[in-house]
Design a protein with these regions (language model features):
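Divalent-cation
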Residues: 11, 24-25
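C-terminal binding/interaction regions
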Residues: 2-18, 71-76, 80-121
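Intrinsically disordered, low-complexity, basic-enriched segments
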Residues: 7-10, 29, 37-38
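Solvent-exposed alpha-helices and their adjacent loops that cap or buttress functional pockets
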Residues: 20-24, 43-47, 70, 78-81
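Structural motif
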Residues: 25-30, 50-53, 76-79, 84-88
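Short amphipathic alpha-helix segments
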Residues: 57-72
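Short, conserved charged micro-motifs
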Residues: 39, 62-64, 94-99
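Short glycine-/aliphatic-rich beta-strand segments at the starts of folded cytosolic domains
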Residues: 30-31, 39-57
Length: 121
């Protein structure tokens, strides 16, 4: 491995660089059921029944996701960041689950995004 351009001649350790590679994917789709008031205060939302979080690449996809989510269920979009792809929504547990499921499905079927499974805590 000493001949590899990815190892250091002195230590033999792997050296690499992590780069952002654009792709179309939903990295995270998670529902926090009945979040504690301290968590809600930390992220700047009122105490909802549920908190839905998504991370989407490219980041502009979060705008589309927010549109789909609000049309799919009675949720409030609390935060959208088109640069990082973060989307945060609140609402009743069933509404947030419905919104996240519909959003992941729409991004997959309409735009060809690689989906993430819906997770819960």
């Amino acid at each position: 491995m000493a001949d590899s351009p990815f190892t250091s001649e002195q230590s033999g350790n792997f050296r690499g660089t992590l780069e952002y590679v654009p792709g179309k994917q939903v990295t995270l789709a998670h529902v926090i059921r009945n979040p504690r008031k301290s968590l809600c205060a930390a992220v700047g939302v009122d105490n909802p029944g549920a908190l839905g979080i998504m991370t989407i690449t490219p980041g502009e996809g979060s705008i589309i996701a927010a549109d789909v989510a609000t049309k799919a269920a009675a949720v409030n979009v609390e935060f959208v960041d088109r640069f990082t792809g973060c989307l945060m929504m609140t609402g009743e547990i069933s509404a947030v689950e419905t919104a996240l499921t519909a959003t992941v499905q729409a991004l997959k079927e309409i735009l060809g995004f690689f989906p993430a499974p819906l997770t819960h805590s």
